[in-house]
Amino acid sequence: MRETKDLREKARQFLTILIPILITQAGLSLITVLDTVMSGKVSAADLAGVAIGSSLWTPVYTGLAGILTAVTPMVAQLMGAKRQKDVPYTVIQSIYVAGIISLAVIVSGYFLIDPVLENLDLERKVAVIAKQYLICIGLGILPLFVYNVMRCFIDSLGKTRVTMLITLCSLPINFVLNYLFIFGNFGFPKLGGAGAGLASAITYWCICLISLYIVHKKTPFHQFRIFGTFYSFSFAESMKLLKIGIPIGFAIFFETSIFAAVTLLMSHFDTVTIASHQAAMNFASLLYMLPLSVSMTLTIVVGFEAGAKRFKDSRAYSYLGISIAVGFSLFTALIILLFREQIAGLYAADRDVLLLTKDFLLYALFFQLSDAIAAPIQGALRGYKDVNYTLVTALVSYWIIGLPVGFVIGTYTSFGAFGYWIGLITGLAAGAVGLFFRLKRIQNRYIHTQSM
């Protein structure tokens, strides 16, 4: 990371950081896509089971991992303020927090999986597959959260290409493991949807160990000597992380759990509808990787500039990121319109699932446009360490506006399952508007304060 003088330099540095993050996010998303697609080749029940399992796991993981993303603005601002010596302490305390979070998830899951699944109106076979999937993926919870800390540290230094390479290594590992455990090839047990969870867990162990080795041994990370000094657990330092991380985590949880809630509310529909909904949602999640990557990039560059008190530069980066995300969303909207039948065909061989997935994809087109505005703004606000408003916005727009609208339309009109998607679009649009005005206010406040 370095100071930039004009828009061209900013664009060059922004893209240098963004492109590896985008590839990394797409790669991580492809792990879930591979789970879904390959499970769907076994049976519709396996596809639906993985869909339900993912819907329960994803909001929990993304919300708790969101707490750990506080590492990024904290380290970025330390680097901008030239306080490199404080970085190792922050990273180690974050690893302690990651371990505590992992233990809490494992213990909670042990007691809650059965009651939650029993209260869902699921076909017996689908419920069994969902439980097996969750148990298997739980074996990789600890390394996944530790990897998140390592990734945030690496990315906050602007070295996003490193995490990109780690992710690219993980894809063939996950594909091969899926091939072995889902289908039972080469003498391995045929586990179906559960095999997808086991494959992902093993993959998480691999990327965690690789990242730890790189941080410990490779330039420029080893010069920080992250593991060179033993630091005991500090409640005070952990609270600094949690003060920033908890609002981020809950905001992400409210956003991702709304999609999970919709899937669960749709559980009374038939297996074809659930499978089609999940297939379309998986593809929409893949498209979301660009605005999410822009968001993560903005947290790094805005945090760096804010730490250095260059607030006009941080504002310029914010609008650059939003422009890139919106431009890409318009392009992907065109792709969906032209190739939705081919996209649907990637997810299912069943004719009924394919036809219904095509219709769901049209709704995905609209809410990814709102994501292109909301996600980058969230990233910019996190760079300023302004996280509480994002939390409130997520709660109101998704749960107080989006979900009720979706439930009413989905339950009491002829739109049926599509009504829930209309609710999602409404919530995302409301959130985007609220976040935009917040960003303007924060930017003006910092610039005005600096000019006094």
Swiss-Prot record:
Bilayer topology annotation: Multi-pass membrane protein
A GO cellular component annotation in the UniProt record: plasma membrane
Transmembrane segments: 12-34, 49-71, 91-113, 128-150, 162-184, 194-216, 245-267, 282-304, 317-339, 359-381, 388-410, 415-437
Keywords: Antiport, Cell membrane, Ion transport, Membrane, Transmembrane, Transmembrane helix, Transport
GO BP terms: monoatomic ion transport
UniProt GO MF annotations: antiporter activity; xenobiotic transmembrane transporter activity
NCBIfam families with a match to the protein in the record: matE
PANTHER family: FMN_FAD EXPORTER YEEO-RELATED, MULTIDRUG RESISTANCE PROTEIN NORM-RELATED
Function, in words: Multidrug efflux pump.
The name this protein goes by in its record: Probable multidrug resistance protein NorM
Taxonomic source organism: Bacillus licheniformis (strain ATCC 14580 / DSM 13 / JCM 2505 / CCUG 7422 / NBRC 12200 / NCIMB 9375 / NCTC 10341 / NRRL NRS-1264 / Gibson 46)
Classification of source organism: Bacteria, Bacillati, Bacillota, Bacilli, Bacillales
Gene: norM
